[in-house]
Amino acid sequence: MAKSKDIRVTINLECINCAQNDEKRKKGISRYTTQKNRRNTPIRLELKKFCCYCNKHTIHKEIKK
């Protein structure tokens, strides 16, 4: 049986450059879905991933659902 509070949770990562830019030429915000272990990484996750809207590798931060 699963515990009431799962250790491994699904999180969303969002590009910080796209979220802060208000340019009209941007078509959206890059988001990735991944999993993290709450016991090993209790703080918010930051990963460097490719953003298809910025066309470069940028920092993606964990966002609330």
Curated annotation (Swiss-Prot):
Belongs to the bacterial ribosomal protein bL33 family. It is found in: Plastid, Chloroplast. This is Large ribosomal subunit protein bL33c. GO terms for cellular component: chloroplast; ribonucleoprotein complex; ribosome. Keywords: Chloroplast, Plastid, Ribonucleoprotein, Ribosomal protein. One of its GO terms (biological process) is translation. It comes from the Eukaryota. GO terms for molecular function: structural constituent of ribosome. The gene is rpl33. PROSITE patterns: RIBOSOMAL_L33. InterPro entries: Ribosomal_bL33 (IPR001705), Ribosomal_bL33_CS (IPR018264), Ribosomal_bL33_sf (IPR038584), Ribosomal_zn-bd (IPR011332). PANTHER family: 50S RIBOSOMAL PROTEIN L33, CHLOROPLASTIC, LARGE RIBOSOMAL SUBUNIT PROTEIN BL33C.
